[in-house]
Regions:
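N-terminal transmembrane-helix/juxtamembrane module of multi-pass inner/ER membrane proteins
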Residues: 2-73, 113-120, 125
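Membrane-embedded catalytic cores of phosphoryl/pyrophosphoryl-handling enzymes
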Residues: 2-13, 133-226
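Juxtamembrane loop-transmembrane helix junctions in multi-pass integral membrane proteins
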Residues: 4, 47-57, 84-88, 164-171
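Hydrophobic, lipid-facing residues on alpha-helical transmembrane segments of integral membrane proteins
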Residues: 11-18, 66, 70, 98-107, ...
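Aromatic-anchored segments of alpha-helical transmembrane domains
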Residues: 19-24, 101-107, 178-188
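Structural signal for the C-terminal ends of transmembrane alpha-helices
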Residues: 25-27, 73-85, 163-168, 211-217
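Membrane interface segments of multi-pass transport proteins and intramembrane proteases
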Residues: 39-48, 73-87, 220-225
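Membrane-interface loops
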Residues: 88-165, 171
Length: 226
């Protein structure tokens, strides 16, 4: 069963990445979805929803939250070397820590976001900015950091729980997507990201969590970390 699930998980994510990217290359849906939150008639505040108090809380505390989760995982991993009651959770804690560090930390923010140069919606010409729209995956030549969504990766980091869970996987998957897409919504209201940025953030973090789980976690024996 695990072998088949491993195969289908990878195929489904790769197909979704290809199909959604093609849709955004061949249509103007990326632009149209972003335009829902753009109100040019409101002079001086063309992205008004971004000021909602709840959305501001989500924006301000997303990264402190995931840092706290990472620090907690690191603490459990370190404590497992001195306290027996933490030892059964050593591998799980290290796996969660690695997913956070390599997914949102390295791949999303340091590799893609910092170097892809895709303009944010707020900075493209259609929304009063200076840059031309660039479709997802295509590298831009601006200082903008639209591709991919960093705040969304905070939610997607909980793909780690999906992989670790032995039961109710679909529930954990739904909760992870719900959290990530809520974060994506907060960024779209400010003109910070396109839908394609949000989806690609998920594809990347999922692939990191997938590779760590099947390439390392599922292969090692608990005794190897003693």
């Amino acid at each position: 069963m695990t072998h088949y699930r491993r195969f289908y998980e990878l195929i489904i994510v790769l197909l979704l990445a290809i199909l959604t990217t093609l849709v955004f290359w061949l249509t103007d849906w990326d632009y149209r979805l972003a335009s829902i939150f753009y109100h040019p008639e409101k002079i001086g505040d063309v992205w008004p929803l971004q000021h909602h108090w709840f959305l501001k809380i989500l924006f301000d505390y997303a990264f402190p939250f995931i840092v706290a989760v990472g620090v907690s995982a690191l603490s459990i991993f370190l404590l497992s070397h001195v306290h027996d009651h933490s030892r059964p959770y050593r591998r799980q804690a290290l796996y969660v820590l690695l997913v956070i560090a390599l997914g949102p930390g390295l791949v999303v923010n340091l590799i893609f976001k910092d170097h892809w140069g895709r303009p944010r919606p707020v900075h493209i010409q259609e929304f009063g900015g200076e840059y031309q729209y660039i479709p997802p995956v295509k590298i831009g030549h601006t200082l903008d950091k639209s591709f991919v969504c960093g705040h969304c990766s905070v939610g997607y980091a909980f793909f780690a729980v999906y992989f670790l869970a032995k039961n109710h996987k679909l529930i954990y998957l739904a909760l992870t997507l719900g959290l990530a897409w809520t974060m994506g919504f907060t960024r779209m209201t400010a003109g910070g990201h396109f839908v394609s940025d949000i989806l690609w953030s998920g594809y990347l973090v999922f692939l990191v969590a997938y590779a760590l789980y099947y390439g390392w976690y599922a292969r090692i024996k608990p005794s190897s970390l003693e």
